[in-house]
Amino acid sequence: MEKEKLTDVPLHQIQIKDAFWDKYIRLVKDVILPYQWNTLNDNVKDAAPSHCIKNFKIAAGEAEGDFEGAVFQDTDVAKWLEAVAFTLDSSGRDETVSYTHLTLPTIR
């Protein structure tokens, strides 16, 4: 049996046009990503601080202080950036871009 050769499809060529999924794609873009941004920056009232962005700023020399939180918390920022990148590529640029402009220079 011959194996079928698979090829990559650029993400911008993929469009999800379905009423069921559209609702969730909009929810991620309009509600979840901004909420997560606030969580990563310790701006959610009554939520335990994550120290994620603060730790990156300390490591980059942009802020003073000591590392706080779990050693694996940098992955939260990486996962958030991946979700933002997917959202931007599939729905176009919007206010979410400003969050990445604030984050990317720090983690370089």
Where are these regions (language model features)?
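Generic hydrophobic alpha-helical segments
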Residues: V28, T87, I107-R108
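Conserved small/polar residues in nucleotide/adenosyl-binding loops
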Residues: T100-T106
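Short, surface-exposed helix-loop/turn micro-motifs enriched in polar/charged residues
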Residues: Q13, G92-Y99
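Low-complexity, Ser/Thr/Pro/Gly-enriched N-terminal "stalk/linker" regions
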Residues: M1-D76, L102
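Well-ordered alpha-helical scaffold segments within catalytic/enzyme domains
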Residues: W21, K79-E95
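Residue-level signal for functionally critical sites in structured catalytic/ligand-binding pockets
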Residues: Q73-E82, I107
